Swiss-Prot record:
Organism of provenance: Shouchella clausii (strain KSM-K16)
Sorted UniProt keywords: Cell membrane, Cytochrome c-type biogenesis, Disulfide bond, Membrane, Oxidoreductase, Redox-active center, Signal-anchor, Transmembrane, Transmembrane helix
Membrane topology designation: Single-pass type II membrane protein
Descriptive protein name: Probable thiol-disulfide oxidoreductase ResA
NCBIfam families the record matches: PRK03147.1 (NF002854)
Stored InterPro entries: Redoxin, Thioredoxin-like_sf, Thioredoxin_CS, Thioredoxin_domain, Thioredoxin_ResA/DsbE_sf
Length: 177
């Protein structure tokens, strides 16, 4: 009888310890993921990247225009599905809204092949060291950040977008005339 009581105590302690560890890890992971996360209503973190056409894009140089920032990867099926919607909206709003598609650390040849295959004309840059991705707290792809003409984050969206959503998002950051 003594051995089984001791065994139950060890099992209970082990289960309790595992639960405490799981809770601790969850709290740590949530805090770590929010460290760099941008928040709606706050100024967008400035960044500069050179796109595949060798044009420099700096967020801070776009005061007076809304900016549509899309984080994506060629390996991401939802990213691929939304690209035609983004392309159509870009063509419609490119005179009123700036746009940058930030590829998350893939080879330039892979990215260029994807762009060519899909006929994309909007600016695409590769975040080779994931510095911008980390600064914005991006986890799952795709992720879209909308910044208004004053440099304030208006929306943070993670996940695929429908065509209607893409047009609504672009329209929402068109500066007031």
């Amino acid at each position: 009888m003594g051995k089984s009581k001791k065994k139950r105590s060890i099992i209970r302690f082990t289960v309790l310890f595992a639960i405490v560890c799981a809770i601790g890890y969850t709290i740590y992971a949530n805090a770590a993921s929010e460290q760099g996360a941008v928040k709606v209503g706050e100024p967008a973190t400035n960044f500069a990247l050179v796109d595949l056409e060798q044009e420099r894009f700096e967020l801070g140089q776009n005061q007076g225009k809304g900016v549509f920032i899309n984080f994506w990867g060629t390996f991401c099926e939802p990213c691929e599905r939304e690209m035609p919607y983004i392309e159509n909206a870009y063509e419609q709003y490119k005179d009123e809204v700036e746009m940058i598609a930030v590829n998350v650390d893939e080879a330039p040849l892979t990215v260029q092949s994807f762009i060519n295959r899909h006929g994309l004309t909007f600016p695409v840059a590769i975040d080779e060291r994931r510095e911008v991705t980390r600064a914005y707290g991006i986890g799952p792809l795709p992720a879209t950040i909308l910044v208004d003409e004053h440099g304030i984050v208006q929306k943070v969206h993670t996940g695929a977008m429908t065509e209607e959503m893409v047009h609504e998002f672009f329209q929402s950051i068109v500066p007031d005339a």
